[in-house]
Amino acid sequence: MATFVDTVTLHLRAGNGGNGCVSVRREKFKPLAGPDGGNGGNGGDIVLVADPQVTTLLAYHRGPHRSSRNGGPGMGDHRHGTLGEALELHVPVGTVVKDADGNELADMATPGMRFIAAEAGQGGLGNASLATTKRKAPGFALLGTRGYEGDVVLELKVVADVALVGYPSAGKSSLVAAISAAKPKIADYPFTTLHPNLGVVEVADSRYTVADVPGLIEGASEGKGLGLEFLRHVERCSALLHVLDCATLDPGRDPISDLDIILTELAAYPVPDGQVPLLDRPQLIALNKIDVPEARELAELVRPELEARGYRVFDISTVSHDGLRQLSFALAELVEDARTKAAEEPEAPRIVLRPRAVNEKPFTIRVDGGSYGDIYRVIGTKPERWVQQTDFTNDEAVGYLADRLAKLGVEDGLFKAGAVAGSSVVIGEGDGIVFDWEPTLTSTAELITSPRGADARVDPISRRTNQARREDYFARMDAKAEARAQLVREGEAGLWADEDGTDEDASSDAKA
């Protein structure tokens, strides 16, 4: 079973906003108390938090589906809905957040950093908040909007000061175990280490972390041997330590050729913009396993060539601990120098998300061809949100939506795009709400005489009132009385006769 996971896909669903409430205050001796419907509560966001106590994404590998709570609906007496509780997901420091298309959304490189991965829906307004001087008692409320629902990819990149790189079985895990309190898995076969191991080294007044990166082989920068998975963890390290095996028995291998292959793979690996290339970072070389006589001889043989290339070379043994103290102090010097340079460099500019300008066009209109004629598609944040907030079972709410769209300039835009009465209009991408567009001719002031919950521009679809039923009943009774009177008049005029040809007393029959 996996115990270390550095890449996972999360399926997130943020909480929806609560619906607003339609309510009118009814209290003795206060006939004009007005509307008192409360607003719906906002849903809960899903927030990622960089936590130094978390070292793996294993918990999200086993449970990738996460959702936050919805906002509560509004209630009467001006009571607002409850706020949905935000869901905090703790991730390791160094986690990179990407969308489903691979675009980077956030880099959780600082402990305590927070990022809203899924934004919650907004609560709808109650009719008390929608009341105006012209619409004193709205018979509708706005619905809550839906929260974000989608996938994000979490990719962990280990944050350490020094990365140990080298061929498999070069002794990197043994070195981490020898200079720190870490206890990585150690065995006598290649690729024993399948995930990075971190160790903390304390030397005099210096303290730094080292990362045991799994073994690299030729072609690692192209993905061979899971190389891309391994090289990703080298990106954030400020210094590199090449661990070279001087006791290898593989044909065709020696410390010089191993170093050349590792350098080639490091040079071919693309680092993100703004980061120092891997080969431009401080590097040291450790010739390992000198406790073996043949290995010590080989180390003495290759040392001059490595020093001629400009490297500082250390002969070490993780078994006898020879040279480890000198190596630890040398690594501490590199780390302190890197930290000093990082403190002197100006801080990277902070990305600030600014709201759109007031005069920016709030929507666009696109004409799409359809099988039954042109479809005019309205794309914009406001129109799409307003459609989500509209209760289409309430005629007054539909009329309010029409007023908002007209005030925003959607109708003028449709006219300019060539739309005519009866044209199909869709708001939003995909299968949005389809309208048979009718231009608004009635002003809001003329609509205030409509009963609550109705709009004169929308065909009435509600059932008949008691007054309408009474009027229909009396109309039917009057029609029956008129029919009887007509029969009497026709009988008196002799228009009716029996089968034998004699006249029938229509009036007596009508009375009977």
Curated annotation (Swiss-Prot):
Annotated organism of origin: Clavibacter michiganensis subsp. michiganensis (strain NCPPB 382)
Record-listed GTP binding positions: 166-173, 191-195, 212-215, 288-291, 317-319
Binding of Mg(2+), residues: 173, 193
Single biological process term from Gene Ontology: ribosome biogenesis
Sequence ranges assigned to domain OCT in this UniProt record: 355-439
GO molecular function: GTP binding; GTPase activity; magnesium ion binding
Annotated keywords: Cytoplasm, GTP-binding, Hydrolase, Magnesium, Metal-binding, Nucleotide-binding
Keyword Nucleotide-binding attributed: yes
Gene giving rise to this polypeptide: obg
UniProt EC number: 3.6.5.-
Family listed: Belongs to the TRAFAC class OBG-HflX-like GTPase superfamily. OBG GTPase family.
Name of the molecule in the record: GTPase Obg
Protein purpose: An essential GTPase which binds GTP, GDP and possibly (p)ppGpp with moderate affinity, with high nucleotide exchange rates and a fairly low GTP hydrolysis rate. Plays a role in control of the cell cycle, stress response, ribosome biogenesis and in those bacteria that undergo differentiation, in morphogenesis control.
Disordered as annotated region, ranges: 491-512
Example of a GO cellular component annotation carried by this entry: cytoplasm
Chief site of localization: cytoplasm
Residue stretches making up the Obg domain: 2-159
